[in-house]
A protein has these predicted regions:
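Glycine-centered tight-turn and secondary-structure capping sites
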Residues: 46-50
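RNA-contacting regions in translation and RNA-metabolism proteins
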Residues: 1-42, 52-77
Length: 77
């Protein structure tokens, strides 16, 4: 799933080399993905009124739901 998130994020930003995805699992089984992009690209990832980041979160949740897991996406600035 990290690869999917990185692929989608790289398609949205101007500096795809700066995209980094780090995933870790919390005690309750929730997988948290931290997405790091260049400072100039944070707005592109978040989108107008958060629509783009919400769409990314929805895609990640749909992928995780197949496995019965819970996923969170944080954009690190």
């Amino acid at each position: 799933m990290e690869d999917l998130l990185a692929y989608l994020a790289r398609a949205l930003v101007d500096d795809p080399d700066a995209v980094e995805v780090e995933g870790f699992e919390e005690d309750d089984g929730t997988v948290v993905y931290e997405l790091t992009v260049a400072d100039d690209d944070v707005g592109k990832i978040i989108g107008r009124h958060g629509r783009t980041v919400n769409a990314l979160r929805t895609v990640m949740r749909a992928c995780a739901a197949r496995d019965g897991r819970r996923v969170l996406l944080d954009v690190v600035d």
